[in-house]
């Protein structure tokens, strides 16, 4: 979202930097991310201090990145005193998307992310985003406890409470995502989850998880199974839209769940009425509409 800050948090070695580079490639060329998600072509700036230029170059070669080099710039050394310089660069170069990797390395030289100073840095970034219209995506780490496994050895799913450091950090972002390795496919390919934890922008449903497949050879990601969950998301959005229109156009009439279910189900004239919508899905989306109404 333009003029806002989003954060992606994950354990070390999960692939945050690779995901950033893959998004950068898609945005600078205007190509769909994962060959599925539309992007807006624009200038991108990456502030990278979580890995060296040499290591990054090796990763780019392995990923076979093909960005539009005229639309991407990098910064490999950073100090919080460079905030004003960053703002001027964004304006001068018409940068619309800025990646920062990672928050702890960029703003936590002292190693203490639990102070109010972390909140000050978030305030400063938000100020730059608001003044320039640039969208920021900041990579961050999870607390060390996140590495612990449950008794059944299943990976722990990130929550906002797992974000490392002060609550001021999470409070200062508009949207937040948690990323983790969910397991492996039958062929040993690593599988990842990307969960929408903070939804102030309302991009998709809160706590929705994209399913990503990873390639150990290329270190690239792709949407896994039913377009990474996009097919189910599209179906749910379609149900929600139909319910909203039906209720709005029939106000103040009252409907039962069964009546709403029948009304939005597909009709096949040659074989009678056939439902393509599970009634449980209707109930779930109705609860979502009630929650949305309560928030407004």
What annotation goes with each model-predicted range?
Residues 38-127:
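Conserved inter-motif catalytic segment of the P-loop NTP-binding fold
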Residues 91-94, 131-132, 185-296:
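C-terminal regions of RecA-like/P-loop NTPase motor modules
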Residues 7-8, 13, 17-18, 45-47, ...:
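Phosphate-binding/switch region of NTP-binding enzymes
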Residues 33-39, 145-155, 271-276:
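Short helix/loop segment immediately N-terminal to the Walker
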Residues 12, 27, 31, 51, ...:
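Conserved NTP-handling cores and scaffolds of large molecular machines
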Residues 17, 76, 111-118, 166, ...:
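Flexible, glycine- and charge-enriched loops at secondary-structure boundaries
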Residues 22-23, 59-62, 112-115, 151-159:
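Short, glycine/charged-enriched secondary-structure capping and boundary segments
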Residues 1-67:
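Walker A/P-loop NTP-binding active-site region of P-loop NTPases
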